[in-house]
Amino acid sequence: GVLNLGIGGNCVVRGGLGPTALERFDRDILSQSNVRWLIILEGINDIGSAKTQEEADKIAAELIAAYDEMINKAHAKGILVYGATILPFAGSFYDTPYRQTARDTVNEWIRNSRQFDAVIDFDKIMRNPDDVKTILTDMHDGDFLHPNQAGYRRMGENVNLGLFK
């Protein structure tokens, strides 16, 4: 089976709705039986909370440290961890140059750190080729941030199911 333990409006390390992903990681992931794989797709709300470039840089570093902590804990339990890049958000209420820089920093780390067992590049799958900082026009729900039904379908259809064998 599949467990989706994402919470709308949640953050990895600070604020957001409900306990942070890092706070609930042991309970939500490590305490579950027979977990073999984990996809981490979280961080946009942390980045969206930044009010300055300095804060955005700090949040990017905190996200990377939190991902690293979750990866290490999961690996210690024999769980394969797949990192998913953060979707484009230009045109949304989160769109500022410093938040874009933080997203780019985090996505670069997800893609190139070699900490994850594999990377699911949702950024690449969902971005507009004519403006790579924006989500494809017909793939969001009107806010340039959240995928719509077609967007989620596109994301799902582009996950390599061979990762789960």
Identify what each model region corresponds to.
Residues 1-2, 33-38, 76-82, 114-118:
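Loop/turn elements at helix/coil->beta-strand transitions in domains of secreted/extracellular proteins
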